[in-house]
Design a protein with these regions (language model features):
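Short beta-strand to alpha-helix junction loop
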Residues: 101-122, 203-204
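Extreme N-terminal leader/targeting segments of oxidoreductases
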Residues: 1-11
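Glycine-rich FAD pyrophosphate-binding loop
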Residues: 29-48
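N-terminal FAD cofactor-binding segment of flavoenzymes
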Residues: 46-86
């Protein structure tokens, strides 16, 4: 096939998550015809109001400035900035690492208008991307594979609640509450999430979440929690050496230290 034919051939992407939408937007802005396929009904549909962190300390450049340089508008979704975190040690001692700039931003995942999923979706559509939901395609018919995890190496289980407590973040390393992993507390604009992540003993997630909630209520007596619902998810962590396979590009999600990852991660993350 001639190079000119390849350059004009429509690009099909499997997965309308953040990676798939970002790739589609850039390609569409470059003049390519792009079709994104997803088996779900909407971008972010596999999330349920989950909070995730976008870390901002591993590079000199601010991540939102990088987004802007890449042609994305971060004002299209809600993001709450933090410069400090409660770091809870295994012996329950709490220290507070601080940064003189934005250390990380909390975003919400899901189908609500203010989520990062919907913000990226709007920008993809504005760039001319055609998104096909409830669409099943074969990997061999796609140029880019961005469909998230297939395996499970960890599970996360949490409880969302209403609270009058001010915005706050806590990250805990305690193997008795989160075997092999970590737990965390996030509060943003009156909504909180306490979550435990399990690399081991995953069948006992209910027990570990209950014990984790009890720990936070004991050590943060002003939480003033009014439970809304419990949410769960799975995660998979692999060190991949390849970004192309059988002529198709593989997209991965770079991890945040407290991100409830459900995506495969590359070795350069």
């Amino acid at each position: 096939m001639a190079d000119s034919d390849v350059a004009t051939k429509p690009i099909h992407i499997m997965g309308a998550g953040l990676s798939g939408l970002a790739a589609a937007t850039i390609l569409a802005k470059a003049g390519r015809e792009v079709h994104v396929h997803d088996i779900r009904t909407d971008s972010g549909a596999r999330f349920d109001g989950d909070f995730q962190a976008l870390e901002n300390w591993s590079m000199d450049a601010d991540f939102f400035q990088q987004l802007n340089d890449w042609g994305f508008d971060a004002s299209q979704f809600r993001a709450t900035e933090f410069q400090v975190v409660d770091l809870i040690h295994p012996d329950d001692v709490i220290t507070q690492p601080k940064s003189d700039r934005v250390a990380y931003r909390i975003v919400e995942r899901g189908t609500a208008e203010h989520t990062i999923d919907q913000g990226m979706k709007r920008q993809a559509i504005a760039a001319g991307v055609s998104i096909h939901y409830k669409s099943r395609v074969k990997e061999e018919d796609c140029t880019i594979i961005a469909c998230g995890p297939k395996g499970t190496s960890a599970v996360a289980y949490g409880e969302i609640f209403k609270t009058s407590h001010p915005n706050h973040i806590a990250f805990q390393l305690n193997d008795k509450l989160a075997p092999g992993a970590y737990s965390y507390l996030i509060i943003v604009d009156g909504v909180g999430l306490i979550c435990t992540c399990l690399w081991r003993k995953q069948s006992k997630s209910e027990r570990f979440l209950n014990e984790t909630i009890a720990w936070y209520e004991k050590h943060y007596p002003n939480l003033d929690r009014a439970p809304i619902k419990r949410v769960g998810g799975k995660g998979d962590f692999t060190i991949n050496q390849r970004y192309k396979q059988d002529g198709r590009c593989l997209l991965y999600t770079s991890p945040s230290p407290r991100d409830r990852q459900k995506s495969r991660m590359p070795s350069s993350a």
